[in-house]
Amino acid sequence: MELNFEKPLSLLTLDEIDQQEGGVIQSFRTGHTSPYPDPADWLNGEEPPPGVFITSVEKVLNWSRHYSLWPVMFGLACCAIEMMCMAASRWDLARFGMDIFRASPRQADLMIVAGTLTWKMAPWLKRIYDQMPEPKWVLAMGACGTSGGLFRDSYSVVPGFNLVVPVDVYVPGCPPRPEALMRAIMDIHEKIDKTRILKR
């Protein structure tokens, strides 16, 4: 059954549209029940034609996540300046697919936390982390982010972001250079490539 385009869509009632769409869906269900053939059967030992590749859904999803990281910036101190340098034209962050920093954590999958975190600010870091959709990664930037840095013994400083949120990659330095941050992003890429979607 095909959709009837003799009448303009604006003149059809919702019931008529639903009925026609239901018929098309039902024809797909009944007409396309044969299983997808094994590639070995239709390739006959030959190479696939140009433009065709065979892979798993897991690899495709990891590939797309690898090349489209959407970072949210949580800059707290001097390390954030180096993060801004990395986003400038000299280091060309766009080649990693993350040229636009997101304003909302709900649109991001990578949080780059840079600088000194105080206990008063820690609940806000956790709140932003909780607002990010899965899968999500956290990159701790600088000595203050990894261990508290120069202010470690202060009563008000969190000695490492891992006490508040799970951290995937640490970037040492005070402040770390943009090259170190780019290396950490490549480490995140490697971690994404090894992510298992289906548990076996």
Swiss-Prot record:
Its cofactor is [4Fe-4S] cluster. Keywords: 4Fe-4S, Cell membrane, Iron, Iron-sulfur, Membrane, Metal-binding, NAD, Quinone, Translocase, Transport, Ubiquinone. The keyword Membrane applies. Gene3D superfamilies: 3.40.50.12280. The keyword RNA-binding does not apply. It comes from the Bacteria. Pfam families: Oxidored_q6. Belongs to the complex I 20 kDa subunit family. NDH-1 shuttles electrons from NADH, via FMN and iron-sulfur (Fe-S) centers, to quinones in the respiratory chain. The immediate electron acceptor for the enzyme in this species is believed to be ubiquinone. Couples the redox reaction to proton translocation (for every two electrons transferred, four hydrogen ions are translocated across the cytoplasmic membrane), and thus conserves the redox energy in a proton gradient. This is NADH-quinone oxidoreductase subunit B. It comes from Dehalococcoides mccartyi (strain CBDB1).
